[in-house]
């Protein structure tokens, strides 16, 4: 199993726009961090935990060519805003299973309604299979 930390920054990323904080002004490459996401490769499977607004860049930089499923930890934009960027994976692999608590799935349906439409769905819209995570474990 291999685990790749694609992003370990804050909800705004690092550096923060307009910030004078020393870390934000640092020239050290370790102080340039994208928003949180993890890519796990296990045998022939590939999973992503959270896909925020930096998801596209993270996939291109990491060389990830396949994602079998996405797990969303919670509904904040810095963990979910990259949902639209799963389309290239849909084109190659079809529907993407997404795992999340029910409140997260409901939030995604509100924010990305076009993804979940069943009638007159926009051609090329992401295709997902929501799978609810329950707390009974």
What is the predicted function of each stretch?
Residues 1-137:
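Binuclear metal-dependent hydrolase catalytic cores
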């Amino acid at each position: 199993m291999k685990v790749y930390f694609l992003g370990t920054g804050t909800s705004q990323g690092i550096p923060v726009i307009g910030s004078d904080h020393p870390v934000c002004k640092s020239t050290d490459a370790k102080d340039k961090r994208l928003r949180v996401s993890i890519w796990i490769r296990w045998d022939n499977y590939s999973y992503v935990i959270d896909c925020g607004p930096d998801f596209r860049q993270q996939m291109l930089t990491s060389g990830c060519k396949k994602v079998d499923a996405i797990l969303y930890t919670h509904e904040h934009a810095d963990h979910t805003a990259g949902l639209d960027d799963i389309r290239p994976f849909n084109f190659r692999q079809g529907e993407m299973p997404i795992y999340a608590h029910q409140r997260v799935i409901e939030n995604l349906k509100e924010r990305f309604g076009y993804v979940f439409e069943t009638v007159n769905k926009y051609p090329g819209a992401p295709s997902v299979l929501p799978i609810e995570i329950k707390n009974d474990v």
